[in-house]
From Swiss-Prot:
Organism listed in the record: Staphylococcus epidermidis (strain ATCC 12228 / FDA PCI 1200)
A GO BP entry: phosphate ion transmembrane transport
Gene Ontology CC: one annotated term: plasma membrane
Keywords attached to this entry: ATP-binding, Cell membrane, Membrane, Nucleotide-binding, Phosphate transport, Translocase, Transport
Protein name: Phosphate import ATP-binding protein PstB
Gene Ontology terms for molecular function: ATP binding; ATP hydrolysis activity; ATPase-coupled phosphate ion transmembrane transporter activity
InterPro entries reported in the protein's UniProt record: AAA+_ATPase, ABC_transporter-like_ATP-bd, ABC_transporter-like_CS, P-loop_NTPase, PstB-like
Enzyme Commission designation: 7.3.2.1
Its job: Part of the ABC transporter complex PstSACB involved in phosphate import. Responsible for energy coupling to the transport system.
SUPFAM superfamilies (UniProt xref): P-loop containing nucleoside triphosphate hydrolases
Gene: pstB
Top-level taxon of origin: Bacteria
Origin organism lineage: Bacteria, Bacillati, Bacillota, Bacilli, Bacillales
Length: 291
């Protein structure tokens, strides 16, 4: 390679914070863990011609997106592009906003979640949610984890004990907390609180886990632990994660959807999105030229 080409490549790498190299290396490792080819995976969510308004604000426009089971799907895009609105539509949390209205379909396991007869309670049991800020209840760690199972009628202490251990192990935090189960969750670090929230989500045995920027309020070490956990969880769950962190999307996801101005601008395998995007606006965004 000529010296001028080397210099240009180094300049590009600096501009993009090494996104391409991170994506190529890390997603290759991720794909080794995904031994089942995409062609053999079922579609867990199929969004078809979805439009969503907050009053007069047309927040989502003609969204068509198929999300595969046992994948980590990253949703990226600039602020206000519709990322968080989209994942909150997946469990109908958007309906908490009085002015919201929708058109189109979201099929979860082939059933339209907007059907009048579809149970929101059942949907939110099958589809767990982890928010940007850790939000444990002002209760003990034990009571946080057992809240969902108790709500669903489980009262037997032995069964609840087993759920607590299984859930905390699933969130990779059992060894840290097994001797502190009856202390207030507010006394934990931010990273520990977030993993307790993930454990609380696992306690109701969901099929899908939605994560809305789950590490944005965490320190780098806690962020790494949550990312490692996400990789482990995808063996048993389908994970859809909103993130502003391009390197995080490259590290943890199998598929990436780039949202822009309420549209899905591009959706593909993560390594392709980051190393060879089909659209110039996608390339500009992941390269840090806007956002």
């Amino acid at each position: 390679m000529a010296n001028s080409q080397v210099a240009e490549k180094e300049k590009l790498d600096a501009q993009t914070n090494n996104q391409d190299s991170v994506a190529t290396i890390v997603t290759t490792e991720n794909n080794k863990k995904n031994t089942i080819p995409d062609s053999e995976k079922k579609i867990v969510y199929s969004t078809q011609n979805l439009d969503l308004w907050y009053g007069e604000n047309h927040a989502l426009q003609n969204i068509n997106l198929d999300i595969l089971e046992n994948n980590v799907t990253a949703i990226i895009g600039p602020s206000g592009c519709g990322k968080s609105t989209y994942i909150k539509a997946l469990n109908r949390m958007v309906e908490l906003v009085p002015s919201v209205k929708t058109a189109g379909k979201i099929l979860y396991r082939d059933q339209n979640i907007f059907d009048a007869k579809y149970s929101k309670e059942k949907l939110r049991t099958n589809v767990g949610m982890v928010f940007q800020q850790p939000n444990p209840f002002p209760k003990s760690i034990y009571d946080n984890i057992t809240y969902g199972p108790k709500t669903h009628g489980i009262k037997n202490k032995k069964i609840l004990d087993e759920i607590v251990e299984k859930s905390l192990r699933g969130a990779a935090i059992w060894d840290e907390l097994k001797d502190r189960l009856h202390t207030n969750a507010y006394g934990l670090s931010g990273g520990q609180q977030q993993r307790v929230c993930i454990a609380r989500c696992l306690a109701i045995e969901p099929d899908v886990i939605l994560m809305d920027e789950p590490t944005s309020a965490l320190d780098p070490i806690s962020t790494l632990r949550v990312e490692e956990l996400v990789q482990e969880l995808k063996e048993n769950y389908s994970i859809i994660m909103v993130t502003h962190n391009m390197q995080q999307a490259a590290r943890v996801s199998d598929k990436t959807a780039f949202f822009l101005n309420g549209y899905v601008n591009e959706y593909d395998d993560t390594d392709k999105i980051f190393s060879n995007p089909a659209d110039k606006q996608t390339e500009d965004y992941i390269s840090g030229r806007f956002g």
